[in-house]
């Protein structure tokens, strides 16, 4: 149906009407600024989450993104999180059966993970091991959330052991460290 107005105000009105808090910009390299301005104009600000990578300036209104990464041994630092510590990335690696890399990179970067089991009708269930790891990471991250927007975030903080990587998250008088073991074996000793 023709709403009688351009898409940005029509979408903003609809999102306000249904009480939505955001829009997933599937396949988009950034939700255009016009949508954010229209949402603000109707008094119903929205979180925009494009699938692709928006321009750096678009982080001002694309406050979330998907994180579709390669997972090298040394964890990559999420560019958008680095530029804007309040930016929330949701790691999406929908076809991978082992979610270890997703969870480690999310934990290292202080960002989220998208648990997507039914991918357009194709089942890619989460294993009991990954489900338990997800529960543990969420249990640690939820009470520490204020640290993960620290402008003093220091990714790739030096560590003593091979294959052990950390991010340092200072906030006031306290600091949180997120530490990941990228080895395929356990590591013990001072870090």
Predicted segment positions?
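Short intrinsically disordered, low-complexity coil segments enriched in acidic
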Residues: 2-6, 176, 191
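Active-site-proximal substrate-binding groove within the catalytic cores of carbohydrate-active enzymes
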Residues: 34-35, 39-190
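Hydrophobic residues within beta-strands of alpha/beta enzymes
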Residues: 23-26, 114
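Active-site-adjacent "subsite" loops/lids of carbohydrate-active enzymes
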Residues: 1-22, 29, 72, 80
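Short His-Asn-centered micro-motif
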Residues: 25-28, 49-51
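Structured segments of extracytoplasmic/periplasmic soluble domains
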Residues: 14-17, 26, 41, 109
């Amino acid at each position: 149906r023709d709403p009688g107005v351009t898409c940005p105000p029509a979408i903003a009105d609809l999102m306000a009407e249904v009480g939505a808090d955001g829009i997933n910009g599937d396949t988009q390299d950034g939700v255009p600024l016009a949508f954010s301005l229209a949402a603000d104009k109707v008094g119903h600000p929205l979180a925009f989450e494009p699938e692709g990578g928006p321009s750096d300036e678009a982080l001002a209104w694309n406050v979330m993104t998907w994180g579709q990464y390669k997972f090298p041994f040394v964890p990559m630092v999420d560019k958008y999180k680095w530029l804007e510590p309040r930016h929330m990335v949701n790691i999406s690696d929908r076809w991978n059966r082992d979610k270890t890399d997703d969870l480690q990179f999310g934990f290292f970067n202080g960002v989220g993970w998208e648990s997507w089991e039914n991918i357009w009708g194709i089942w890619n269930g989460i294993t009991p091991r990954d489900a338990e790891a997800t529960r543990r990471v969420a249990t640690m991250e939820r009470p520490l959330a204020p640290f993960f927007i620290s402008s003093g975030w220091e990714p790739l903080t030096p560590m003593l052991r091979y294959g052990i990587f950390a991010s340092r998250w200072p906030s006031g008088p306290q600091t949180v460290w997120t530490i990941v073991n990228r080895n395929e074996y356990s590591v013990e000793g001072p870090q």
